[in-house]
From Swiss-Prot:
Protein name in UniProt: Cytochrome P450 monooxygenase macH
EC code: 1.-.-.-
Residues given in the record as heme binding sites: C454
Superkingdom, taxonomy of origin: Eukaryota
Cofactor or coenzyme needed: heme
Predominant place of localization: membrane
Subcellular localization, as worded in the UniProt entry: Membrane
């Protein structure tokens, strides 16, 4: 009997000892003998993903999303290549960017990273280049500049509606939360492009409609999901239980229900013969293209595609417009020069002008380029997998095949060797002659580069040109207590500002 009572304790001790020895040996190997041990970095990074989680989730109360900035500081001390995981290297060298993300790059997307987004059946998450090309077949003509130009009247309706809301709030003596307003504007534009019908986010009294709020709250939760993938298992629990455990599960469920409702509504409208006057994302997704290998996705695939397009088109464009407008109205010299240029094609605040005319304005173009650089709305790193054969860096160090390697758009846009005084909003840097501007433009990468770059680039540019031009020409924004400190941000997948950009939106008289 005594032997039986002691035996379980002995087994537990043996198991615990084996576990401890295994992890001790693994730690020694990872830190000192792994092929990636030649790269400097925190020893904690070599041991697991939780070093990154510390900086993105819990570095200190009230301040998260600091990994991006910690990497910047470490690169300046330790060099252009850092170890940031058991199987990951982060690169800071701008010259490597166009190798990693060029067209035809052999560095494929890491499936595990992009499935964190919660839309595993989307084109964005597809890592296989052949399947990715097939998935893009219906999307490329839809996002072409020619097709996007046909959307101009629809986009103009939303800009006018946004202006009306600004007038209403000014008449009530209420300041506008510009970030929420501009995200609502972007949401209405991209949702009508996706479904043929706007979500009418601009109608919300505070610009905080459910879809805008859900995306605002869901994206920061991806840091938690990346660090603790088992959180997704909560989706299998009844919602009333899961949402008590994790707010991100509730937000994810809201997103799925939102997309499913929109698909059902679109199908019902199409069955009733109600079709939009312009091509929509849903319409194109429902047309097979057998010669290009594209088959119509199932409902989950449609849902995932719609969620990624709307998410990418709402937050990022809204953030870029928010940062750009703040810096215009916070800098009198930039403001006055831009307004004077706009008056050459828009003689009165009520003037309408074509997108192509706006696109031809050099200072407006410089302001928008600088806004995209300065805001870096998709700032985080985008990891790829090192191809077979590995890669040798210019300094001779070797990265084995299968290693995750990535760079961050923010680190390119704020690199002092590429952009002098990068923390200064300076549109003049884009007006220093064609050769200098062309060289700098190689490293303006808000939409990434290569075959995996953002499909929505033409739509985003049109939205920015129209929003910036018409708001600046129509309104004299009076900042209400907003400072540059408020516009600093944490990397919560997309920038999350420390404060709020509030402004009284007074109509110009001339």
């Amino acid at each position: 009997m005594a032997l039986l009572s002691v035996l379980p304790v002995s087994l537990w001790l043996i198991a615990a000892g084996t576990f401890a020895v295994y992890h001790a040996i693994r730690a020694v190997y990872l830190i000192f003998f792994s092929p990636l041990a030649v790269f400097p970095g925190s020893p904690w990074a070599a041991l697991g993903e939780y070093w990154e989680a510390y900086w993105n989730i819990g570095v200190k109360p009230g301040r998260k999303g600091q990994m991006l900035f910690k990497l910047e500081e470490m690169h300046k001390r330790l060099g252009p290549a850092l170890r940031m995981g058991p199987n990951e290297v982060h690169i800071y060298d701008p010259a490597f960017y166009h190798e990693l993300y060029r067209p035809g790059s052999r560095y494929y997307k890491d499936p595990s990273m992009h499935k964190v987004l919660g839309a595993p059946s989307s084109t964005l998450a597809e890592s296989d280049p052949v399947r990715h090309k097939q998935r893009k077949a219906p999307l490329e003509p839809l996002f072409s500049k020619k097709n996007i130009l046909s959307l101009e009247p629809m986009l103009m309706e939303h800009v006018d509606r946004c202006s009306q809301r600004f007038d209403e709030l000014f008449a009530q003596g209420k300041p506008v939360s510009m970030e929420w307003a501009l995200k609502s504007l972007a949401m209405d534009m991209v949702s009508q492009f996706a479904f043929g019908q706007s979500l009418n986010a601009l109608a919300d009294p505070e610009f905080k409609s459910l879809p805008v709020r859900v995306f605002q709250q869901y994206l920061p939760s991806l840091h938690v999901i990346k660090a603790f993938p088992f959180v997704r298992l909560l989706n299998s629990l009844p919602l009333w239980i899961a949402k008590r455990i994790s707010h991100s599960v509730e937000m994810g469920h809201e997103l799925e229900q939102f997309a499913a409702r929109r698909i059902d509504e679109y199908m019902a409208a199409a069955a009733a013969g109600k079709t939009p006057t312009f091509p929509t994302l849903m319409e194109r997704l429902l047309i097979p293209i057998p010669e290009k290998g594209y088959a119509v996705p199932d409902k989950q695939g449609l849902r995932d595609e719609l969620l990624t397009v709307i998410s990418a088109g709402d937050d990022t464009t809204g953030i870029a417009n928010t940062v750009t407008l703040f810096n215009i109205f916070n800098n009198r010299e930039v403001h006055d020069r831009l307004l004077a240029e706009l008056k050459t094609v828009m003689p009165t605040p009520n003037s309408h002008v074509s997108y192509l005319q706006l696109e031809a304005l050099p200072y407006l173009t410089a302001v928008i380029k600088e806004g995209l650089r300065y805001s870096s709305p998709a700032a985080s790193r985008t990891p790829r997998l090192v191809p077979p054969g590995g890669v040798r860096l210019p300094d001779g160090r070797f990265i084995p095949a299968g290693t995750r390697v990535g760079m961050a758009i923010y680190h390119i846009h704020y690199n002092e060797t590429l952009f002098e005084s990068p923390r200064v909003f300076d549109p003049e840097r884009w007006l220093q002659g064609p050769e200098v501007t062309a060289e700098r433009a190689k490293f303006l990468v808000p939409f990434s580069r290569g075959s995996r770059s953002c499909l929505g680039i033409n739509l985003a540019y049109m939205e920015m040109y129209m929003a910036i031009a018409y708001i600046v020409r129509r309104f004299d924004l009076d900042l209400v207590g907003t400072t540059e400190e408020d516009m600093k941000w944490d990397d919560m997948v997309v920038p999350q500002f420390h404060g709020e950009f509030m402004a009284l939106t007074k109509r110009r008289e001339d």
